[in-house]
Amino acid sequence: MQGHQPAAYTLRKHETEVTCLKVVSWEPYPVLASGDAKGELYLWNLVTRRPFAGYKLETKAQIIYIKWLNNYLIVLSKDHTLRFLQLHNETAVAIRGWAGNQFELQSFKIVYEVPVNTLNFANVVVTHMRESQYRLWCCNTMDSESIDVYEFDVKEQRSLRRLVSGINLYKAIIKAGNWSTGESLDKTGIVMCFLEHNGVVYLGYECGFVLGLQLVERSGENPTIVVSYVSSVHYPEPVLSLCYNEREEVILSSSTNDAIGVHALQAHSVNVSESEIAFFSIEEGIAIKRDLTLINKSIHLPTSKIGHLGCVDGRLIAVDWSGRTLVCEKDETKFCFSKQRSNVLVDESSAGTFDQGKAPRCHIKATSMACIGKQTLRELRGIRRGEKRRTELCANRSWCFTGYEDGSVIMQSFET
């Protein structure tokens, strides 16, 4: 069947750099959450390409991280605060948010706040534990090279409890059996990024290492951080981004060079039971596999300085520091686009290759990215025929959303 012609649209609402984008599950079709350098947040209807909800932080602090979980918009900002936001009127949004007509933006209210160290630009990991209780992985309050783990109840303002404090994983790295003692590494550097998948939390460090961690709680004892995976694939360059490739079942990482680290899940999805803990060396609350070795596997892309990674149906989407967005299949570029100072979207694709040496230098800087694959829609009820047709057209395409320093978001389709 012949593929669709690529489509591109511009989402305009932000007046400053778009620093964070996140696709959010919604009915009948996912929506996009966006945040900027001055603390403004929006939820976008991707069929009408209009915002239907918004919020402005009083501190005007830059948005670093966005997640939608259990009807909470979870937001980390540079004022050292993680906030749980909730729509004032979820029913109104559900009924009216999908209509094509203009209406006043729905607003959010703050339901919970947690202080978080944001001296660097690392994100956090937030997971749901039970009922209204959540777990937070983040940089240590005073030291961005170490991590803390908290639990809290969003319905109890004074429920914050620290499970793990100031864990530094430098010793775990140098204990890897095949780490060359001739290599120079006196510290990990700061934590650059976090990612959680299937109970394992992945950390990307300034020194180029990627670690897979689990938190084990045993009755009557303090929690233990289990180091189940270590890779030095990017050493000594910093890890810039982490993402999950569902089709290949791997975690991918990027850095300042052209290498994409490939971290296979089977190598580190360890279920640590009471009996298995004997195979670990435990010191200062950190458990390390006695046979821990570095696992370094990578592929290479025709660009470098990859600040943002995403995966859709096996395709790898990469955004580099110069402003280019590449859609790749393994190491081959299938589609490439950028936004120039002339405000024109430029298709740089050329027979599946990308010549970095001839790239123009007038791109607008890309500052955030999110992506979504083709969607299977449930039966569409209660919406007009025209809206139904437009929703189906959106669902039959894969999309990349790239945020730029001029406040715009490009919504670009591509084939998968």
UniProtKB/Swiss-Prot annotation:
Major localization class: nucleus
Alphabetical keyword list: Chromatin regulator, Nucleus, Repeat, WD repeat
Localisation: Nucleus
Segments forming a coiled coil: none
Start-end of each WD repeat: 13-54, 58-95, 111-147, 234-273
Protein family (similarity comment): Belongs to the WD repeat ASA1 family.
Protein known as: ASTRA-associated protein 1
Organism of provenance: Lachancea thermotolerans (strain ATCC 56472 / CBS 6340 / NRRL Y-8284)
Gene that encodes it: ASA1
